[in-house]
Regions:
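Domain-level signal for soluble alpha/beta catalytic cores
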Residues: 1-297
């Protein structure tokens, strides 16, 4: 596997800043496309090549709002997801398109998003486990080869969900940062299997994660998890909750954004020791701007 195009300088800068600052990450891409661009029947990854100017515009809005870290529009851009969504271009093309779209916004730092693959597996020597690991390796290499500063395996609901994905990402990483982000319940434990967050942190770090965090959970869940993660982690902690489930209307899903609540919460997360804060589904650049103002960015 050729790693000569990996962005080593960007990786070093990401590691340095995660260790010394509280960075502000962008908000979501998928829910913005869904709510503002009437994209209910269009997979987000499709936009990377078909409507790159739209993806870049959303990234630019986040940068203008104060985001220091952008996240590629590749949450569902593995070969498995592209086949499911009937997207013809290759994994390399779609992921490079997403990286190029994000780079058009001139971010300070750029993470490559990798979401759940959706294949069940039962044993580490099974064909299914090897398939997931290979799919993750392929997407990780595509993102790194396109120039991201690090990988972000996000919306992880269980250790079982994480195992082959982290292994595959590490196969491709060759020393590049791999960040892991879990979904937790309101007690701060993993949503999918109920494992306590301390054990999840231990597993992720033991198997090579360079950062641990939570995303796509409620504010209450994030508030419960962050102090526990900071206390148990030896790597930087990240936090990016959502605003809850949308209300279904005739015009599609509507989220009730609460920028003030996120602005207040991000101060608490910084005080608790979080290295990167942001927001997930249902928020927009309005929330990012409120957080940037609260953090004096």
């Amino acid at each position: 596997m050729d790693t000569s195009y990996y962005n080593r300088f960007g990786a070093e800068e990401l590691a340095r800043r995660l260790s010394n600052e509280t960075l502000l990450a962008q908000g979501p891409m998928g829910s913005v496309l869904l709510s503002e661009y009437d994209a209910a029947d269009i997979p987000p990854a499709f936009w990377n090549l078909a409507e790159p100017q739209t993806v870049s515009r959303i990234h630019r809005l986040y940068v203008a709002a104060g985001a220091q870290v952008l996240i590629t529009n590749t949450f569902q851009a593995s070969s498995y997801a592209l086949k499911h969504d009937q997207i013809a271009p290759s994994v390399a093309e779609v992921n490079r398109g997403a990286v190029d779209d994000a780079r058009q916004a001139h971010p300070q730092l750029l993470l490559g998003s990798m979401g759940p693959i959706g294949i069940e597996w039962f044993a580490e020597d099974s064909a299914e486990y090897r398939e997931i690991r290979g799919i993750a390796r392929e997407q990780a290499h595509a993102l790194l080869n396109a120039g991201v500063d690090g990988l972000l395996i996000e919306t992880v609901t269980s250790i079982r969900n994480l195992q082959p994905m982290l292994a595959g990402a590490r196969d491709a990483a060759d020393g590049m940062p791999v960040l892991v982000s879990f979904v937790v319940d309101d007690k701060g434990d993993l949503l999918g299997d109920g494992l306590n967050i301390e054990a999840a942190v231990l597993y992720a770090e033991k198997h090579g994660a360079n950062s641990v965090g939570v995303n796509c959970c409620s504010l209450a869940a994030a508030n419960a998890a962050v102090p526990r993660m900071v206390a148990s982690a030896t790597t930087p902690v990240t936090v990016r909750p959502n605003v809850g489930d949308p209300v279904q209307t005739q015009d599609g899903p509507v989220w009730h954004e609460n920028p003030e609540a996120f602005a207040r919460a991000c101060i608490e997360w910084r005080h608790a020791g979080a290295a990167m804060v942001g927001s997930c589904c249902g928020t927009t650049a309005i929330t990012t701007a409120a957080m940037a103002e609260a953090l004096d960015i």
